[in-house]
Amino acid sequence: VMDNKDKLSGKIKILFQPAEEGVRGAAGMAASGIVDDCDYFLGSHVAMSAKSGEIATNLYGDLCTTKLDVTFHGKPAHAGACPQDGRNALAAAANAAVQMLGISRHSDGMTRINVGQLIAGEGRNVIPSKAVMKLEVRGETGEINQYMVDQVTNICKGVAIGFGVTYDMRKMGEAVDLTADQELVDVLNAAGRATPGITVVDKPLN
């Protein structure tokens, strides 16, 4: 940018996103108002599938995602002396995890789900009173991603009833879908083709 500053006009902002992995950084940056006066926004990701020396601009349908923490609350009891008095939060969470991994795929596009952590229990002879599940869902569109969130919610409700426990769900982060602006794609492609050593990949990589 500095090498070409006398050829440029207007204002250019360079932003680096914190907390990308939990998809919290971009939301906070947008809420701060720092991009409110931007006419165009160019984003890049080091994990994209273009090779060195290539630029890919015709992107669409990056998977939306929602990160959720679900906590099941049961009732502790001695597993040997009085198990009937307990409500097993770990058993509820484990059952929910199995059901979540069996959610039917969506006919309109890709879906993903992963239960990455399940933390529970106080001791080997104690009915677990609390279980924390950390999971994520993904969908090709916002609607498909919401379908996955709804399915997870329905499973948690049913499991809570079946196991006599309660639960709470917290949204820890989310990312919406992406549709590139064709006018800007054309400008970037033309600039890329005019730059020695750069190959333009003019097709979706998804």
Where are these regions (language model features)?
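Active-site alpha-helical elements of protease catalytic centers
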Residues: 1
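Histidine/acidic-residue-rich, glycine-tolerant segments that coordinate divalent metal ions
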Residues: 6-117, 122-126
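Metal-dependent amide/peptide-bond hydrolase catalytic core
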Residues: 90-206
